[in-house]
Amino acid sequence: MALCRRISYLYALALLTVYALFLPLGGYERMMEGKYRAFLLLSLGYVLAMTALGAWKAVRWRAPMCLAALAYLALTALSAALSPYGTAVLLGGTRRDGLLTAALYAAVFLLLARHLRPDRRLLYAAAVSAALCDLLVLVQLMGRNPLWLYPTGLNYFDGDVAYSGFYAGAAGNIDFTAFLLALCAAAMAAALVRGWSKWLLAPFALTMWTLWQLRVAAALLGLAVTAVLGLPLLFPRRRRAMWALTLLLTAAAFALIWFFPGDGGTLSELHRLLHGDVDLTFGSSRLLIWRSLLPLITERPLLGGGCGTLYLRDVPPFYWQRGGEITYFAVTSAHNEYLGVLVDQGALALLAFLALLALALWRAYRHAESDRCAVAGAALLCYAVTAFFSVACCITGVYLWLLLAMLAPKEE
């Protein structure tokens, strides 16, 4: 048992450091495939090592969170078995979000939920990783090409001109980089509120500055919502007062959005939406993408099309309008992790997934007196909000299952 705990701890530490900072050869052009191979190496190695040690015998199969994870895996496997796209479900598309990835997520969660004993050192390691990523991003935002991650002669500001999208940091696409930095920022903020080491102020401030410079609306929104909804989590002894303050701040936020039209950007889009002015190009055309997926849901509502098969289905391209030019892009992701599960794995798998997420958040709030639950709960809450606008892949997804495992009941 002690060896299983040690290996689980080392695996979690590797995810927060080695994997988070891993940069594949070939730079951003090879980022997704390189990260996926690193994920397979770490996660398959961990699962096989734990299997050899007989670690599965100790798994609490009847625990509510484990049952939800097993239901999610079983329904995902059933969706894959009945998919009309054959073996394409095993690996999925270019983001490698197929059955193999989903199975590894569930296996890693079940093992970590029983054997991982998280402590402060894991957050400190994540803070160091975030700070190093911050420094890389800030240098890239100066127009430099450190570590030759961009093609020769190009830099960050060539995004959406010489190549599609914007890339920075150790996760590739700035949406992924900002997503991971937001999770670290939420966890560090919770730890600072709980009186952990003050040296966390340095990486926290650096991470917040980097997020502001990247201007990824989904990550900033995730942090803002976490700051409000996380109050009862961070101050459990004043729970009633914190819930009242949360409701007050939520009402104030809605009032601000309702009355303040903004001068462009996300705030203006939210203002127009509240007033019934719906433009499908809002959120980088996310509304257009989500609407285009509705026919796919009605085709296979219960079990979906199979893991990672959205790119094989008949979805109209979405577009961005810049000045007088319109650029079209193929839809290969739902750009919403929950909608992605609904389309690919069906409503039943989505219900199991939401049940697992709800159980974890319920534990975080119920046991908020525990620093472990408060810190992991804040990061999970940030993930749950940001995922509403995110693309599912192993670069970010593995950290969801790590956080879920941290919030699972632990036996001393």
Q: What is each of the regions a protein language model found here?
A:
Residues 145-168, 268-283, 308-343:
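Interfacial juxtamembrane loops and adjacent helix segments
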Residues 11-28, 45-106:
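N-terminal hydrophobic segments of proteins, predominantly signal-anchor/transmembrane helices
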Residues 10-15, 19-20, 41-50, 73, ...:
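Alpha-helical transmembrane segments of multi-pass inner-membrane proteins
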Residues 173, 294, 300, 325-362:
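A conserved mid-to-late transmembrane alpha helix and its immediate loop/hinge
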Residues 24-40, 86-113, 258-282:
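Alpha-helical transmembrane segments and their immediate interhelical/interface regions
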Residues 28-33, 90-94, 171-175, 214-222, ...:
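Membrane-interface catalytic loops of GT-C/OST-like multi-pass glycosylation enzymes that act
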Residues 1-12:
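N-terminal membrane topogenic signal
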Residues 104, 136-152, 259-309:
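Aromatic-rich transmembrane-lumenal/periplasmic boundary elements in polytopic membrane proteins
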